[in-house]
Amino acid sequence: MRTSYLLLFTLCLLMSEMASGDNFLTGLGHRSDHYNCVRSGGQCLYSACPIYTKIQGTCYHGKAKCCK
């Protein structure tokens, strides 16, 4: 009986994830913009980019700039 409740709970969690457009199944293989910025040698800043750097992209879903 306990395992059936556990399976039902797991199924409900999966269905709730699928209801929202951004779930773990669509996110497989995709890296966050923050990860890509830092990996390419940049840094994420909410303010303007420092002197002698330029904007290479965005971070935190477009809320910050990736400066490199």
Curated annotation (Swiss-Prot):
Q: Which residues are the signal sequence here?
A: 1-21
**Proregion positions:** 22-32
**What is an example of a GO molecular function annotated in this UniProt entry?**
identical protein binding
Q: Which GO terms describe its cellular component?
A: extracellular space; membrane; microvesicle; sperm midpiece
Q: Name one GO biological process term.
A: defense response to Gram-positive bacterium
Q: What is its main location?
A: secreted
Q: What InterPro entries does the entry give?
A: Defensin_beta-like (IPR001855)
Pfam families associated with the record: Defensin_beta
List keywords of the entry alphabetically.
Antibiotic, Antimicrobial, Defensin, Disulfide bond, Membrane, Secreted, Signal
Task: Please name the Gene3D superfamilies in this protein's record.
Answer: Antimicrobial Peptide, Beta-defensin 2, Chain A
Q: How does it assemble?
A: Monomer. Homodimer.
| Family label | Belongs to the beta-defensin family.
Please identify the protein, giving its name as recorded. Beta-defensin 1
The species is: Trachypithecus obscurus
